[in-house]
Amino acid sequence: MRETILGNHIRKVPSVAVGCMRLSEKSKDEMNHFIHAALEQGAYFFDHADIYGSGMSESIFGEAFADDPSLKREDMYLQSKCGIRQGFYDLSKEHILKSVDGILQRLHTDYLDLLLLHRPDALVEPEEVAAAFDVLFESGKVRHFGVSNHKPMQIELLQKYVRQPLVVNQVQFSIPVSNLVANGMEVNMETPGSIDHDGSLLDYCRLHNITLQAWSPFQMPAWKGCFLGSGEYPKLNQKLQVIAEKYNVSDTTIAAAWILRHPANMQIITGTASESRLKEIIAACDITLTREEWYELYLAAGHLLP
Protein backbone atom coordinates (compact mmCIF):
# COMPACT_ATOMS: atom_id res chain seq x y z
CA MET A 1 0.00 0.00 0.00
CA ARG A 2 1.33 3.41 -0.98
CA GLU A 3 1.47 5.85 1.91
CA THR A 4 0.54 9.51 2.29
CA ILE A 5 2.13 11.87 4.78
CA LEU A 6 -0.50 13.15 7.19
CA GLY A 7 -0.25 16.85 7.93
CA ASN A 8 3.17 18.23 8.81
CA HIS A 9 4.86 14.82 8.93
CA ILE A 10 2.68 13.62 11.82
CA ARG A 11 2.82 10.09 10.46
CA LYS A 12 2.34 8.09 7.29
CA VAL A 13 -1.09 6.65 6.49
CA PRO A 14 -2.44 4.53 3.62
CA SER A 15 -3.06 6.49 0.43
CA VAL A 16 -6.44 4.77 0.21
CA ALA A 17 -8.76 5.17 3.20
CA VAL A 18 -11.92 3.13 3.66
CA GLY A 19 -14.95 5.42 3.56
CA CYS A 20 -17.74 3.97 5.70
CA MET A 21 -20.67 6.06 4.47
CA ARG A 22 -22.36 3.18 2.62
CA LEU A 23 -21.73 0.44 5.17
CA SER A 24 -24.80 1.00 7.34
CA GLU A 25 -26.81 -1.80 5.70
CA LYS A 26 -24.22 -4.49 6.37
CA SER A 27 -24.82 -7.05 9.08
CA LYS A 28 -22.29 -7.34 11.88
CA ASP A 29 -20.76 -10.43 10.25
CA GLU A 30 -20.60 -8.72 6.85
CA MET A 31 -18.96 -5.70 8.44
CA ASN A 32 -16.43 -7.92 10.18
CA HIS A 33 -15.53 -9.58 6.89
CA PHE A 34 -15.23 -6.19 5.18
CA ILE A 35 -12.93 -4.84 7.91
CA HIS A 36 -10.68 -7.89 7.66
CA ALA A 37 -10.60 -7.63 3.85
CA ALA A 38 -9.50 -4.00 4.11
CA LEU A 39 -6.84 -4.69 6.73
CA GLU A 40 -5.41 -7.58 4.73
CA GLN A 41 -4.76 -5.12 1.88
CA GLY A 42 -3.13 -2.54 4.13
CA ALA A 43 -6.18 -0.26 4.28
CA TYR A 44 -6.30 0.31 8.02
CA PHE A 45 -7.57 3.91 7.83
CA PHE A 46 -11.36 4.07 8.29
CA ASP A 47 -13.34 7.26 7.63
CA HIS A 48 -16.63 7.69 9.51
CA ALA A 49 -19.12 10.48 10.26
CA ASP A 50 -21.78 10.66 12.92
CA ILE A 51 -24.48 11.13 10.26
CA TYR A 52 -23.58 8.12 8.09
CA GLY A 53 -26.62 5.88 8.24
CA SER A 54 -27.85 8.07 11.11
CA GLY A 55 -25.05 6.61 13.20
CA MET A 56 -25.59 3.00 12.09
CA SER A 57 -22.34 2.82 10.10
CA GLU A 58 -20.39 3.56 13.27
CA SER A 59 -22.57 1.30 15.43
CA ILE A 60 -22.26 -1.78 13.21
CA PHE A 61 -18.54 -1.14 12.72
CA GLY A 62 -18.07 -0.81 16.47
CA GLU A 63 -19.99 -3.99 17.23
CA ALA A 64 -18.02 -5.96 14.65
CA PHE A 65 -14.79 -4.62 16.11
CA ALA A 66 -15.73 -5.18 19.76
CA ASP A 67 -16.88 -8.77 19.24
CA ASP A 68 -13.73 -9.88 17.41
CA PRO A 69 -10.65 -10.26 19.65
CA SER A 70 -8.44 -10.55 16.57
CA LEU A 71 -9.20 -6.92 15.67
CA LYS A 72 -6.87 -4.67 17.65
CA ARG A 73 -7.55 -0.96 18.09
CA GLU A 74 -3.89 -0.12 17.60
CA ASP A 75 -4.00 -1.76 14.16
CA MET A 76 -6.64 0.70 12.92
CA TYR A 77 -6.70 4.44 12.32
CA LEU A 78 -10.19 5.79 13.02
CA GLN A 79 -11.40 9.14 11.72
CA SER A 80 -14.88 10.59 12.13
CA LYS A 81 -16.69 13.84 11.46
CA CYS A 82 -19.28 15.96 13.26
CA GLY A 83 -21.20 19.21 12.85
CA ILE A 84 -24.11 18.32 10.56
CA ARG A 85 -27.54 18.19 12.19
CA GLN A 86 -31.04 17.83 10.75
CA GLY A 87 -31.59 21.04 8.81
CA PHE A 88 -28.61 23.00 10.12
CA TYR A 89 -24.92 22.94 10.99
CA ASP A 90 -23.64 23.12 14.55
CA LEU A 91 -20.00 23.62 15.53
CA SER A 92 -20.76 24.78 19.04
CA LYS A 93 -18.62 23.48 21.88
CA GLU A 94 -21.57 21.64 23.39
CA HIS A 95 -22.45 19.84 20.17
CA ILE A 96 -18.86 18.91 19.29
CA LEU A 97 -18.29 17.37 22.72
CA LYS A 98 -21.63 15.56 22.69
CA SER A 99 -21.00 14.28 19.16
CA VAL A 100 -17.59 12.86 20.00
CA ASP A 101 -18.95 11.06 23.05
CA GLY A 102 -21.58 9.46 20.82
CA ILE A 103 -19.03 8.54 18.17
CA LEU A 104 -16.74 6.88 20.72
CA GLN A 105 -19.64 4.95 22.22
CA ARG A 106 -20.81 3.68 18.83
CA LEU A 107 -17.30 2.73 17.70
CA HIS A 108 -16.52 0.99 21.02
CA THR A 109 -13.29 2.90 21.46
CA ASP A 110 -12.00 5.46 23.93
CA TYR A 111 -10.27 7.69 21.38
CA LEU A 112 -10.36 8.92 17.79
CA ASP A 113 -7.16 9.27 15.84
CA LEU A 114 -8.62 12.17 13.87
CA LEU A 115 -11.76 14.33 14.16
CA LEU A 116 -12.96 16.51 11.28
CA LEU A 117 -15.47 19.35 11.29
CA HIS A 118 -17.81 18.08 8.57
CA ARG A 119 -19.05 21.35 7.05
CA PRO A 120 -18.51 25.07 7.71
CA ASP A 121 -21.04 26.52 10.14
CA ALA A 122 -22.03 30.10 9.24
CA LEU A 123 -22.62 30.76 12.94
CA VAL A 124 -19.36 29.22 14.11
CA GLU A 125 -17.61 30.86 17.03
CA PRO A 126 -13.99 29.73 16.66
CA GLU A 127 -13.34 30.27 20.35
CA GLU A 128 -15.91 27.56 21.08
CA VAL A 129 -14.29 25.17 18.63
CA ALA A 130 -10.93 25.83 20.26
CA ALA A 131 -12.36 25.17 23.72
CA ALA A 132 -13.94 21.92 22.55
CA PHE A 133 -10.73 20.76 20.89
CA ASP A 134 -8.75 21.51 24.06
CA VAL A 135 -11.11 19.36 26.13
CA LEU A 136 -10.98 16.52 23.62
CA PHE A 137 -7.21 16.65 23.21
CA GLU A 138 -6.37 16.96 26.90
CA SER A 139 -8.76 14.14 27.82
CA GLY A 140 -7.19 11.88 25.21
CA LYS A 141 -10.46 11.44 23.33
CA VAL A 142 -9.08 12.90 20.08
CA ARG A 143 -5.44 12.86 18.99
CA HIS A 144 -5.57 15.03 15.84
CA PHE A 145 -7.99 17.47 14.22
CA GLY A 146 -8.97 18.62 10.76
CA VAL A 147 -11.81 19.92 8.63
CA SER A 148 -13.92 18.90 5.67
CA ASN A 149 -15.18 21.08 2.81
CA HIS A 150 -13.54 24.23 4.21
CA LYS A 151 -12.04 27.17 2.30
CA PRO A 152 -8.61 28.60 3.18
CA MET A 153 -9.91 31.62 5.07
CA GLN A 154 -12.30 29.45 7.06
CA ILE A 155 -9.31 27.34 8.08
CA GLU A 156 -7.32 30.47 8.90
CA LEU A 157 -10.12 31.75 11.12
CA LEU A 158 -10.28 28.47 13.04
CA GLN A 159 -6.53 28.14 13.29
CA LYS A 160 -6.26 31.63 14.80
CA TYR A 161 -7.93 30.23 17.93
CA VAL A 162 -7.38 26.47 17.78
CA ARG A 163 -4.07 25.46 19.37
CA GLN A 164 -3.84 22.08 17.65
CA PRO A 165 -2.81 22.04 13.97
CA LEU A 166 -5.57 21.29 11.47
CA VAL A 167 -3.94 18.50 9.51
CA VAL A 168 -6.63 17.43 7.01
CA ASN A 169 -9.20 18.97 4.68
CA GLN A 170 -11.55 16.45 3.07
CA VAL A 171 -13.01 17.73 -0.21
CA GLN A 172 -14.73 16.36 -3.28
CA PHE A 173 -12.30 15.53 -6.09
CA SER A 174 -12.49 13.31 -9.17
CA ILE A 175 -11.52 13.56 -12.83
CA PRO A 176 -14.74 15.39 -13.81
CA VAL A 177 -15.02 17.28 -10.50
CA SER A 178 -11.59 18.88 -10.51
CA ASN A 179 -12.04 22.62 -10.25
CA LEU A 180 -9.29 22.47 -7.62
CA VAL A 181 -6.78 22.07 -10.45
CA ALA A 182 -8.77 23.62 -13.32
CA ASN A 183 -8.84 27.17 -11.95
CA GLY A 184 -5.08 27.07 -11.54
CA MET A 185 -4.50 26.19 -15.19
CA GLU A 186 -7.22 28.40 -16.67
CA VAL A 187 -6.04 31.49 -14.81
CA ASN A 188 -6.60 34.78 -16.65
CA MET A 189 -9.14 33.15 -18.97
CA GLU A 190 -12.85 33.85 -19.47
CA THR A 191 -13.79 30.21 -19.02
CA PRO A 192 -15.92 28.40 -16.42
CA GLY A 193 -12.85 26.60 -15.13
CA SER A 194 -11.10 29.88 -14.41
CA ILE A 195 -13.60 30.71 -11.67
CA ASP A 196 -11.97 30.15 -8.31
CA HIS A 197 -14.76 28.65 -6.23
CA ASP A 198 -12.47 27.46 -3.46
CA GLY A 199 -10.02 30.27 -2.73
CA SER A 200 -6.94 28.52 -4.15
CA LEU A 201 -7.59 25.67 -1.74
CA LEU A 202 -5.21 23.22 -3.39
CA ASP A 203 -2.23 25.56 -3.21
CA TYR A 204 -3.14 26.69 0.30
CA CYS A 205 -3.23 23.16 1.67
CA ARG A 206 0.09 22.30 0.03
CA LEU A 207 1.70 25.43 1.47
CA HIS A 208 0.40 24.68 4.96
CA ASN A 209 1.04 20.92 5.01
CA ILE A 210 -2.67 20.11 5.19
CA THR A 211 -3.44 16.70 3.71
CA LEU A 212 -6.22 16.73 1.13
CA GLN A 213 -8.58 13.78 1.31
CA ALA A 214 -10.60 13.17 -1.86
CA TRP A 215 -14.20 12.08 -1.28
CA SER A 216 -16.47 10.71 -4.04
CA PRO A 217 -13.49 9.94 -6.31
CA PHE A 218 -15.75 8.56 -9.06
CA GLN A 219 -18.58 11.08 -8.86
CA MET A 220 -19.92 13.23 -11.69
CA PRO A 221 -20.80 16.90 -11.10
CA ALA A 222 -24.20 17.83 -9.66
CA TRP A 223 -24.60 14.47 -7.92
CA LYS A 224 -25.48 12.69 -11.17
CA GLY A 225 -23.82 9.47 -10.08
CA CYS A 226 -20.67 7.58 -11.00
CA PHE A 227 -18.92 8.58 -14.23
CA LEU A 228 -17.45 5.10 -14.77
CA GLY A 229 -19.41 3.56 -17.63
CA SER A 230 -21.73 6.57 -17.84
CA GLY A 231 -22.98 7.71 -21.23
CA GLU A 232 -22.40 11.30 -20.14
CA TYR A 233 -18.63 10.80 -20.35
CA PRO A 234 -17.98 8.63 -23.43
CA LYS A 235 -14.57 10.12 -24.24
CA LEU A 236 -13.37 9.79 -20.66
CA ASN A 237 -14.53 6.19 -20.36
CA GLN A 238 -12.94 5.30 -23.69
CA LYS A 239 -9.64 6.81 -22.59
CA LEU A 240 -9.85 5.04 -19.22
CA GLN A 241 -10.30 1.72 -21.02
CA VAL A 242 -7.30 2.33 -23.27
CA ILE A 243 -5.01 3.18 -20.37
CA ALA A 244 -6.44 0.36 -18.23
CA GLU A 245 -5.58 -2.15 -20.94
CA LYS A 246 -2.02 -0.85 -21.05
CA TYR A 247 -1.55 -1.45 -17.31
CA ASN A 248 -3.74 -4.59 -17.25
CA VAL A 249 -6.04 -3.17 -14.58
CA SER A 250 -9.63 -1.91 -14.40
CA ASP A 251 -10.93 1.53 -15.31
CA THR A 252 -11.68 2.03 -11.61
CA THR A 253 -8.01 1.54 -10.83
CA ILE A 254 -6.95 4.10 -13.44
CA ALA A 255 -9.49 6.68 -12.24
CA ALA A 256 -8.10 6.32 -8.72
CA ALA A 257 -4.51 6.42 -9.99
CA TRP A 258 -5.30 9.78 -11.63
CA ILE A 259 -5.92 11.26 -8.18
CA LEU A 260 -2.83 9.69 -6.64
CA ARG A 261 -0.66 10.98 -9.51
CA HIS A 262 -1.11 14.58 -8.36
CA PRO A 263 1.94 15.77 -6.37
CA ALA A 264 -0.26 17.15 -3.58
CA ASN A 265 0.00 13.65 -2.08
CA MET A 266 -3.75 13.24 -1.65
CA GLN A 267 -5.51 10.45 0.18
CA ILE A 268 -8.49 8.78 -1.50
CA ILE A 269 -11.62 8.22 0.58
CA THR A 270 -13.44 5.27 -0.95
CA GLY A 271 -17.22 5.12 -0.96
CA THR A 272 -17.78 1.48 -1.77
CA ALA A 273 -19.30 -1.38 0.20
CA SER A 274 -17.88 -3.90 -2.27
CA GLU A 275 -14.72 -5.78 -1.36
CA SER A 276 -13.85 -6.33 -5.03
CA ARG A 277 -14.23 -2.62 -5.84
CA LEU A 278 -12.11 -1.74 -2.81
CA LYS A 279 -9.40 -4.05 -4.14
CA GLU A 280 -9.54 -2.31 -7.52
CA ILE A 281 -9.13 1.09 -5.90
CA ILE A 282 -6.21 -0.05 -3.75
CA ALA A 283 -4.53 -1.41 -6.89
CA ALA A 284 -4.09 2.23 -7.97
CA CYS A 285 -1.27 2.46 -5.44
CA ASP A 286 0.83 0.34 -7.81
CA ILE A 287 0.18 2.56 -10.85
CA THR A 288 1.98 5.80 -11.64
CA LEU A 289 0.43 7.47 -14.66
CA THR A 290 2.65 9.39 -17.02
CA ARG A 291 2.21 13.14 -17.28
CA GLU A 292 0.71 12.64 -20.75
CA GLU A 293 -1.82 10.07 -19.47
CA TRP A 294 -2.87 12.33 -16.62
CA TYR A 295 -3.57 15.21 -19.00
CA GLU A 296 -5.29 12.95 -21.54
CA LEU A 297 -7.80 11.89 -18.89
CA TYR A 298 -8.23 15.47 -17.72
CA LEU A 299 -9.04 16.66 -21.25
CA ALA A 300 -11.26 13.65 -21.97
CA ALA A 301 -13.46 14.73 -19.05
CA GLY A 302 -14.20 17.98 -20.89
CA HIS A 303 -11.73 20.29 -19.18
CA LEU A 304 -9.76 22.88 -21.12
CA LEU A 305 -6.14 23.83 -21.51
CA PRO A 306 -5.61 27.45 -22.64
Question: Whereabouts are the PLM-identified features?
Answer:
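N-terminal binding-site loop/beta-alpha segment at the start of enzyme catalytic domains
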Residues: 1-76, 138, 219-221
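Hydrophobic faces of well-ordered beta-strands that scaffold small-molecule active sites
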Residues: 14-18, 46-48, 76-80, 115-117, ...
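Active-site mouth loops of central-metabolism enzymes
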Residues: 19-29, 82-94
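Short, small-residue-enriched loops and turns at beta-alpha junctions
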Residues: 24, 54, 85-86, 119-124, ...
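Short, acidic/polar
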Residues: 27-38, 91-107, 153-156
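A structural motif
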Residues: 43, 109-112, 142, 166
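Active-site groove signature of glycoside hydrolases
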Residues: 104-125
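Beta/alpha (TIM)-barrel catalytic core signal, keyed to glycine-rich beta->alpha loops juxtaposed to Asp/Glu
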Residues: 126-306
